[in-house]
Amino acid sequence: MVNSANMKHSETDQVSLELGRRVAERLRWQPELVAFALANLARWSRQNIAAPSLLRCYAEWQIILSRPVDEICDLLCAATEDAQRLRQNSPFAGVLAPAEVWAVKSRFRHAPATA
């Protein structure tokens, strides 16, 4: 098994981007996943009521999720610092099967280093 804690920051960013792309691919065909993401945000907001930084992130995602699906998908696939920051707390957790997530992590963890 691949442990995310042992991954380099650049590997974590690559994994996050690939997972975002895979979620976006599903979201284009299953726009109802926006409701799933909103439910995650509602639950997380209740669970993390004493964490203002997380609540700000969740509020930002709520605004994003009110946009058209294509715009949400563009953000999930963007290689920008802002998109990377947002993907760190993606409300789409649970959309991808654990085996798929681990396969992506494993692929990047064991990929040859590029300079």
Task: Map each language-model feature to its residues.
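Basic, alpha-helical nucleic-acid-binding regions used in initiation and control of genome expression
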Residues: 2-115
